[in-house]
């Protein structure tokens, strides 16, 4: 048996695929899985009881994770004049206006999150076909269209993340690194869950958190009992 096969078998022996676990138990399972040579990301996948085809049931927002994601973000800010100077001072990795718009039109997307001042959105909006599919388009709902670029860049550095339901009503979000201690991972997941529950549309009927899975990059997907999460 190959090393890969042994690792997969070892993972499968750590938990019951058909069972739903408490959040703490699910994190323990991820921690007990055979290790790899890099620090894996802990991902959450949540199926929501919404109809994304309806405009009033499209979920998108942001949340500040108490312990950050463990990832060093490359932050881009669309701004001009004094706001551009503020963004540079705040530590944004890329700052510009029309020059950045043209660069992105040419296919460059080597950044993780984009922020824009309101006056830049007329030009930034033209990048929808490039930024939209990559979830990089600044939006007021996510807090990335703002006049306070200093505060926004600082929040992103500290662990503010965006979440968005796709066309199937599923949110996929990286919430931590596996090297975080279990309590830190749990608190980050709980913060995300609280934000998702708060974002529940008034028109959404029936069960809201339909399915909740937590996984690591090279590890299993462990189903979490949603009854615990709804109570947060």
Curated annotation (Swiss-Prot):
Any Pfam family matching the protein: Ribosomal_L1
GO CC entries: large ribosomal subunit
The keyword rRNA-binding is annotated on this UniProt entry: yes
Subunit structure: Part of the 50S ribosomal subunit.
Task of the protein: Binds directly to 23S rRNA. The L1 stalk is quite mobile in the ribosome, and is involved in E site tRNA release. Protein L1 is also a translational repressor protein, it controls the translation of the L11 operon by binding to its mRNA.
Family per similarity comment: Belongs to the universal ribosomal protein uL1 family.
Name used for this protein in its record: Large ribosomal subunit protein uL1
Biological source species: Chlamydia trachomatis serovar D (strain ATCC VR-885 / DSM 19411 / UW-3/Cx)
Gene that this sequence comes from: rplA
């Amino acid at each position: 048996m190959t090393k890969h096969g042994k690792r997969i078998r070892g993972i499968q022996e750590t938990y019951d695929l058909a069972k739903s676990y408490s959040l703490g138990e699910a994190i323990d399972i991820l921690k007990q899985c055979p290790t790899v040579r890099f620090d894996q990301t802990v991902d959450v996948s949540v199926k929501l009881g919404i109809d994304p085809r309806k405009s009033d049931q499209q979920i998108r927002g942001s949340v500040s994770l108490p312990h950050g994601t463990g990832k060093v973000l490359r932050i881009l800010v669309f701004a001009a004049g004094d706001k551009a100077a503020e963004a540079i001072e705040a530590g944004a990795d890329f700052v510009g206006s029309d020059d950045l718009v043209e660069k992105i039109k040419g296919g460059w997307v080597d950044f993780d999150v984009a922020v824009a001042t309101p006056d830049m959105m007329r030009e930034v909006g033209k990048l929808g076909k490039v930024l939209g599919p990559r979830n990089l388009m600044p939006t007021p709902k996510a807090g990335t269209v703002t006049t306070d670029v200093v505060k926004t860049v600082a929040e992103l550095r500290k662990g503010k993340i965006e979440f968005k339901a796709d066309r199937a009503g599923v949110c996929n979000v990286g919430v931590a690194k596996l090297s975080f201690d279990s309590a830190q991972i749990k608190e980050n997941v709980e913060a995300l869950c609280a934000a998702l529950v708060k974002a529940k549309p008034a028109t959404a009927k029936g069960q809201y958190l339909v399915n909740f899975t937590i996984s690591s990059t090279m590890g299993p997907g462990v189903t979490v009992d949603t009854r615990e999460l709804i109570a947060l």
